[in-house]
């Protein structure tokens, strides 16, 4: 099986036992190169596309998917992102999806809402698989009741107005009897909005700078984690919070609430419009609820095994149906 990308926490988590992953971690994937694909078509039973194709033109994606068909290599697609946050138009992203979903043997996604959208927009039935566990709670690390965390960093199209988000989150944390901690990855500290440093200096909020490897630990220390991405189909951070026992406040745009019942939504659409009053209220509502317990490891392990079994059955099905071009 050739996975695109070759390695990723999600791709690793869903890989079934006994399935060999071939290729390397080159970016963009060598499997997008027609010559490489033709030379190695007989070495692979299935190509599984997750992400990593945004840098290609839509016409190139269409030509690539047609080349897979000519070579007789089945394509499996997991749809991770149905929208393109921060882009002025979703046309390019939609065209990419249309190109690969039109030729995929099997389509998967991670929430019922996303599957409904895929059916409506692209006429494909998607198999819904749960997002498997991606973190393990540290038994030595406690959480602070009332502590609200919001990740901030370099300017991003997916978070067009971070100052509005921070001020609304601060209002929600304080009105709910808590406090706000801004989480800043080390690599993004130089690009941090100066206003946030000033707010920390005056004691309005706390800044916590962390290395990327400690992200799950940072989330575990919170009562509430606020997700700031503009409009996601689903979120890995929701699953990390489920694993470590942190309540989530997430945008209403997308299907975050489909992932976990502990998600509290706030109004935020794919065009970057965030309702500050809604965010403040959502944080207050989340703080009024008890902190969830970390996910039961036996249940999460069983869920992961079931997800891997679905992938194993899909791979076996499409490989068995394969006919050489």
Which role fits each region the language model picked out?
Residues 247-253, 257:
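Short hydrophobic beta-strand element within catalytic cores of glycosyltransferases
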